[in-house]
């Protein structure tokens, strides 16, 4: 699968070029990824090594224009998270079963299923219908996201990628240190 690589490092989503440069001590562009006319952009934007999103006090900031308020719903044993955009769109991420092996995301009407690759690893495949659109792999300090290269018009909206993968950080890397 030809793919684009992204990395959640701490509270920041970086493209692979920035993540690799930071790992080598080379710095990297601290700018924000390319943004479309609606202020959100597509998941393929930001190939120059940019910060695509960051989280501060339960708000995800995507580019300069979009923000997503995140609420973890803790009334039940199952994991549930809801996000609301500044424009009022609602995003949900739920654990429908007893375990977190399968998670379901709804991003303003766009449905996704995130399934564990193996019972012994924290990797997940992201499905939209019956099409694999990405893979998420949780490491000790970062969450690596590989997005499939899809036909033009079929790309995942960047806001969907950010919300779904941040929820994977919350589920699969709960001992993270929050900064900011």
Segments from the language model and where they lie:
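Intrinsically disordered, low-complexity proline/glycine-rich segments
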Residues: 1-180
């Amino acid at each position: 699968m030809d793919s684009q690589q992204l990395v959640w490092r701490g509270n920041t989503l970086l493209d692979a070029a920035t993540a690799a440069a930071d790992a080598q001590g080379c710095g990297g562009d601290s700018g924000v990824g390319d943004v479309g006319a609606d202020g959100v952009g597509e998941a393929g934007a930001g190939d120059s090594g940019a910060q695509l999103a960051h989280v501060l006090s339960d708000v995800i900031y995507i580019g300069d224009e979009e923000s997503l308020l995140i609420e973890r719903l803790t009334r039940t044993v199952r994991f549930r998270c809801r996000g609301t955009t500044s424009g009022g769109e609602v995003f949900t991420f739920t654990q429908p079963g007893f375990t977190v092996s399968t998670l379901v995301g709804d991003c303003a009407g766009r449905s996704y299923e995130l399934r564990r690759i193996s019972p012994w690893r924290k990797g997940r495949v992201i499905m939209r219908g019956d099409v694999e659109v990405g893979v998420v792999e949780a490491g000790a300090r970062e969450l690596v996201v590989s997005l499939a290269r899809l036909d033009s018009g079929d790309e995942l909206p960047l806001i969907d990628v950010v919300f779904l993968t941040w929820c994977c950080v919350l589920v699969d890397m709960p001992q993270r240190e929050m900064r900011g």
